[in-house]
UniProtKB/Swiss-Prot annotation:
Source organism of this protein record: Invertebrate iridescent virus 6
Family annotation (InterPro entries): Kinase-like_dom_sf (IPR011009)
Protein origin, superkingdom: Viruses
Record SUPFAM superfamilies: Protein kinase-like (PK-like) (SSF56112)
Protein name: Uncharacterized protein 126R
Amino acid sequence: MKSTFVRSLFSNLEHMNQDSSTICKFGDCYKLKTLIYPFMSGRKTEKIFTCQDVKKISKGEYGNRLIKIIPKKYIISTNNMRNVEVASEAYYNFVANDIEGIHQLVDYLESANHVFFVYHISRGRTITLQKLIETKYGMKIGPQKDYGTTVLNIFKTVVISSIEMYNHGIFHHKLNSSNILINMNTFSPSITNFNYASFVKDEDWKTIVKNLGILLYELWIGHRPDDNDYDEIKIILNHEDSEIHTGIKNFILTTLTKFVSKNEFNILIENLP
């Protein structure tokens, strides 16, 4: 068991100072008691630390904390937030923090050589949406949860989260099943990995809509569509044995084959089952 002292850079931010952390606090410093688990990523520089000190500080707080640690030398960009320089990943996550369906950033910590992203983890098993699709596609999720109904509810939450992020000026470049966490108790989604985020640009609306179409296709067919193979997509969706709801087919085909205005997008959402 390793102990590390770090300073909270969010200690002066009202939103992030609600005393809801499961980490023991010492003023604006934290003592982390952790077990170390390897976490493979593209950068291969991160580790996941799961807090073992689960002291409850706020009433009604259920869950643990997950800490992602990155050496400062690998932080590519930063943003200034209330006179505090933070990694851009933390900044974008913080801006989206209050949106439903976002992996909540509880705190952002800094030591001499590392930054620490502290995330909330709900009680129960958590997997990626990609893993859920791989293991549960076409099957019942538990005795009373139908796969189709479950993933459609997940998708609708992700849609709301995506639009709210857009309205907050944040664009997630890789909104896909591998960057969405699912709590297996509640089947509620959480969008994560804001190192793929940036400020919204005018052309990003088209990409957001297309990414959602790809995600809905993957949820229903079990894999991502081949790039730009729209004829194959139409054949699969319109197969004579297919029982896919018309609203789902229309959403996928429309979002993947044409530009969709905001009004048209709202109609597509309303026509989902």
